Amino acid sequence: MAQNFTKLNPQFENIIFEHDDNQMILNFGPQHPSSHGQLRLILELEGEKIIKATPEIGYLHRGCEKLGENMTYNEYMPTTDRLDYTSSTSNNYAYAYAVETLLNLEIPRRAQVIRTILLELNRMISHIFFISVHALDVGAMSVFLYAFKTREYGLDLMEDYCGARLTHNAIRIGGVPLDLPPNWLEGLKKFLGEMRECKKLIQGLLDKNRIWRMRLENVGVVTPKMAQSWGMSGIMLRGTGIAYDIRKEEPYELYKELDFDVPVGNYGDSYDRYCLYMLEIDESIRIIEQLIPMYAKTDTPIMAQNPHYISAPKEDIMTQNYALMQHFVLVAQGMRPPVGEVYAPTESPKGELGFFIHSEGEPYPHRLKIRAPSFYHIGALSDILVGQYLADAVTVIGSTNAVFGEVDR
């Protein structure tokens, strides 16, 4: 008996060619080593030029927002590590900041100092990681090796503080879990010196490298209008000349007390963005050097004092009956924030990372929404890549510094 087989034709989004002479459809990813995660791009080519780019995401979707709606507020904290996993502490802090805003908590000053140090340390680790991988994409392997060596020292500091090198879980709602270990600040000072030396070395290898500049200059140009229409933030926005940094515009923690600049670009191309990452490393070093002397002038508490939402110190839990009962209720049932909603933006290494939380007074959020910068930057590829050569697609994708843990969520 003859079998009827239905021939399946590939379907692409609105791909119609008037002339087939010099045109081609190319699938880029989702397993391509330069796609920086699970990115699939459907590229329409005319010769070597891209005439249309259609990003397809979702290959790393894990339902992170829905998970948050089915966990207590404290239970969800480790899950935030898995968003932008190259700077986990930034995710931890953004979530904690949103919950603290909802609870109207006052954070002890020592915890604020430690948090700001950790945020800027993570910013440097994330930036040096981007520069090394971006250079490797373009073909500069030596930079990758030197930068990763220095990054390891930063990861050692994070491991000394919280016990983890990648998924840190280093922030708590109401403060931080630990005080700084002995001699940790001395190790931090040494790391700052090593980071300066590494930055000089990288600049020596790249800034006057003719091939590097030819591959990046006038490639992946983003205009101010394009950046605003796509909702870009961070260096993708500042590279166009718009000086918008949430640490300056809506300061949190100790940023309003710190002296630092917001570098901006002139041309909005990939080379401008590389330069801004290098300049922001300098600003992070400058911020940490202001924070180190502040630490010694702070009192010892590292967690907020509020029995409705925050457990008492461990010594009180072990010696006082009421503190033990309060701790048991918070762990077993979870805190119950007031009814309301809040959106708290922060300046992560990638751009504006914010958490929206709608509370109905239950131990878990009624709605949790994550505003991740990489999601918007990947969407903008459909504009940025048009007119670029296929050989430059890897450079453009890399210069967005997107991490797919926070794109797909």
From Swiss-Prot:
Superkingdom of source: Bacteria
Molecular function as annotated in GO: NAD binding; NADH:ubiquinone reductase (non-electrogenic) activity; quinone binding
Catalytic activity: a quinone + NADH + 5 H(+)(in) = a quinol + NAD(+) + 4 H(+)(out)
Pfam families: Complex1_49kDa (PF00346)
Keywords carried by this UniProt record: Cell inner membrane, Cell membrane, Membrane, NAD, Quinone, Translocase, Transport, Ubiquinone
E.C. code: 7.1.1.-
Cellular localization per UniProt: Cell inner membrane
Membrane topology classification: Peripheral membrane protein
Main location: membrane
Enzyme class label: translocase
A GO CC term assigned to this protein in UniProt: plasma membrane
Family to which this protein belongs: Belongs to the complex I 49 kDa subunit family.
Function: NDH-1 shuttles electrons from NADH, via FMN and iron-sulfur (Fe-S) centers, to quinones in the respiratory chain. The immediate electron acceptor for the enzyme in this species is believed to be ubiquinone. Couples the redox reaction to proton translocation (for every two electrons transferred, four hydrogen ions are translocated across the cytoplasmic membrane), and thus conserves the redox energy in a proton gradient.
Subunit structure, interactors included: NDH-1 is composed of 14 different subunits. Subunits NuoB, C, D, E, F, and G constitute the peripheral sector of the complex.
Name the UniProt record assigns to this protein: NADH-quinone oxidoreductase subunit D
Gene that this polypeptide is encoded by: nuoD
